[in-house]
Regions:
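Conserved short histidine dyad/triad with adjacent acidic residue
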Residues: 18-20, 29-49, 81-85
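A generic structural signal for short beta-strands and their flanking turns/coil linkers
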Residues: 22, 33-35, 52-54, 59, ...
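Glycine- and acidic-residue-biased ligand/ion/polar-headgroup-sensing regions
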Residues: 41, 50-67, 73
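Ligand-binding loop in jelly-roll beta-barrel domains
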Residues: 69, 82-111
């Protein structure tokens, strides 16, 4: 039987992704993932391409969508269609926290257009499990 699966996200640690960038997983499926993304002031999410749509709702802080030259603050919502290529940066003095629901893979793109990293729902889930193992934590049931 299928049923709702509530839990307290405060029980999930922030998992490092890159310099000044961490995530708190909320749910993984074969199609996508839901997570909280945290950016420390000045942190940059490098240029990347989405293979599925993305819904991003700013909970706190301000981030600049670099290619669009737009600032998104608390309560701001951004829809990104499949194929969107973008990067962003935390601006201001406080961390940014964004609730993200995304589908499909995401590829990070280097200065010469090469793919430097590919994330899928499965690889991000593996990152979460590895973090839990390395830190002697019991993984939450997020699938």
């Amino acid at each position: 039987m299928k049923t709702s699966q509530p839990f307290d996200p405060a029980t999930i640690p922030w998992i490092p992704l890159g310099p000044g960038e961490s995530f708190k997983p909320l749910h993984f499926s074969d199609r996508g993932r839901a997570l909280l993304l945290r950016l420390e002031p000045g942190a940059i999410v490098p240029l990347h391409r989405h293979f599925g749509e993305v819904h991003a709702f700013n909970l706190s802080g301000y981030r600049k969508l670099i290619e669009a030259d737009e600032i998104v603050g608390p309560g701001g919502y951004v829809y990104e269609p499949a194929g969107n290529v973008d990067s962003s940066m935390a601006v201001g003095d406080e961390p940014v926290v964004v609730h993200i629901v995304s589908f499909g893979a995401m590829e990070y793109i280097g200065a010469d257009g090469e793919v430097t990293r590919r994330d899928t729902p499965a690889s991000l889930y593996d990152t979460y499990l590895r973090f839990c193992t390395d830190n002697n934590l019991t993984p939450a049931a997020l699938r």
